């Protein structure tokens, strides 16, 4: 019996897993074997009847699908609307619970991730356009029975506490919650514990991602030039409970708001054997939930 967050569900964003359609059964069996109850699915997977059948066989739920919004400093690129609509159509067919919006990555912010105030900034009008874009497609998702949240993300135009606040204040809180990715929040200079207190029940989805202090400091100093290199070559993100994240304190704070959504373990890349990192994360998460 869990002492903390008894209604919350544990899933995985399996970026550190190597998916091939020819081994989907093995892939899903491995995820289920670690005890994960849900996953982030891709558009390809959402559109595959065979994959959805295998998910049901392994009792894995389509917890979320990610929707990246291409942006300039003046807001979303209008040509991306058809892609967003397609993502929602596939998510609906797959029975996805949560649509996770985020601004797509950009090379200019990749070079200043973690020190975003020194980089290019989205304009006030751009924030307003982005808010309307998210609301438009969150409404479409709601019509299809899908919840929505927005994910502040390092190396994008919405990374920091300030940028998140500006955007979220312009978005209908009944329509779009906050997806708190604690790893990206740390990279952006924020404190996840404070974020829980600041946003409270507006946090409807959580990505559990931990951060290597050593790699982060090298990225902030410029020794590692971009976040992409920090993630892919130096493994900026580490298994939950092994880095800067105060995992137990996070769960204590979420408990104050009776959080009952998904806790999604995520590690963008990991040292081999990369899939084993997810096993470390879920065991540390379970221990912190006691």
Where are these regions (language model features)?
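N-terminal pre-domain/capping segments
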Residues: 1-98, 124, 132, 142, ...
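Acidic/histidine-rich catalytic cores of soluble enzymes
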Residues: 132-238, 244
